[in-house]
């Protein structure tokens, strides 16, 4: 028997392909901490965090508009399934997260679809999952888009999440003029 025949079979690893876009990425260096086009192997037991805090986040955005921890991804396995899935949780108190136009408030979470658009502020992430067999590891690979992903992929468009934190709270604010007495501020 040759060593080739004795070698362990290499398991295919699930990979999240994440294409990132921000309109100011070229001039501001927002993504300078992210290694593009390399597959990074991570244990499935790890909760992957995205944000601006370099001490707690795996992937850092150099932008004060981003929360210390913006969102997290965690691996899980559905009952009677042989492949891993991901859940996404909004960790930001100040900004909602949109996943395929479903709004997640602070600490809300949902299963991450196999292909989806994640958005907050001016950030756009196109996420595509490639299934693998490994239950021990998964990979993340980043690429950068120079064009808005919403337009490039004909995604149902909405405006960026406003500064007030969520679409629903901004829509309910009364923007019409109000009469105030001279002793009222």
From Swiss-Prot:
This is TRAF-interacting protein with FHA domain-containing protein A. Belongs to the TIFA family. Adapter molecule that plays a key role in the activation of pro-inflammatory NF-kappa-B signaling following detection of bacterial pathogen-associated molecular pattern metabolites (PAMPs). Promotes activation of an innate immune response by inducing the oligomerization and polyubiquitination of TRAF6, which leads to the activation of TAK1 and IKK through a proteasome-independent mechanism. One of its GO terms (cellular component) is cytoplasm. It comes from the Eukaryota. Its main location: cytoplasm. It is found in: Cytoplasm. The gene is TIFA. Homooligomer; homooligomerizes following phosphorylation at Thr-9. Interacts with IRAK1, TRAF2 and TRAF6. Interacts with TIFAB; binding to TIFAB inhibits TRAF6 activation, possibly by inducing a conformational change in TIFA. Interacts with ZCCHC11; binding to ZCCHC11 suppresses the TRAF6-dependent activation of NF-kappa-B. The FHA domain recognizes and binds phosphorylated Thr-9, promoting homooligomerization and subsequent activation of NF-kappa-B. Phosphorylated at Thr-9 following detection of ADP-D-glycero-beta-D-manno-heptose (ADP-Heptose) by ALPK1. Phosphorylation at Thr-9 by ALPK1 leads to the formation of an intermolecular binding between the FHA domain and phosphorylated Thr-9, promoting TIFA oligomerization and TIFA-mediated NF-kappa-B activation. Residues 48-104 form the FHA domain. GO terms for biological process: cytoplasmic pattern recognition receptor signaling pathway; innate immune response; positive regulation of canonical NF-kappaB signal transduction; protein homooligomerization. It comes from Bos taurus (Bovine). The modification Phosphothreonine is found at residue 9. Keywords: Cytoplasm, Immunity, Innate immunity, Phosphoprotein.
């Amino acid at each position: 028997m040759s060593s080739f025949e004795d070698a362990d079979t290499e398991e295919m690893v699930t990979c999240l392909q994440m294409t990132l876009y921000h309109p100011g990425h070229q001039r501001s260096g927002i993504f300078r901490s992210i290694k593009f086009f390399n597959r990074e192997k991570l244990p499935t037991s790890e909760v992957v965090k995205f944000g601006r805090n370099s001490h707690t986040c795996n992937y850092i955005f150099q932008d004060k508009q981003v929360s210390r921890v913006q969102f997290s991804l965690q691996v899980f396995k559905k009952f009677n399934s042989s492949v891993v899935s991901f859940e996404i949780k909004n960790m930001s108190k100040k900004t909602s997260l949109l996943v395929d136009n479903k709004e997640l408030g602070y600490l809300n979470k949902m299963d991450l679809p196999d292909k989806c658009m994640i958005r907050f502020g001016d950030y756009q992430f196109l996420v595509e999952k490639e299934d693998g067999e490994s239950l021990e590891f998964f990979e993340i690979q980043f690429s950068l888009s120079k064009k808005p992903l919403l337009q490039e992929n004909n995604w149902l468009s909405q405006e960026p999440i406003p500064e007030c934190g969520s679409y629903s709270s901004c829509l309910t604010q009364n923007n019409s003029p109000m009469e105030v007495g001279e002793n009222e501020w």
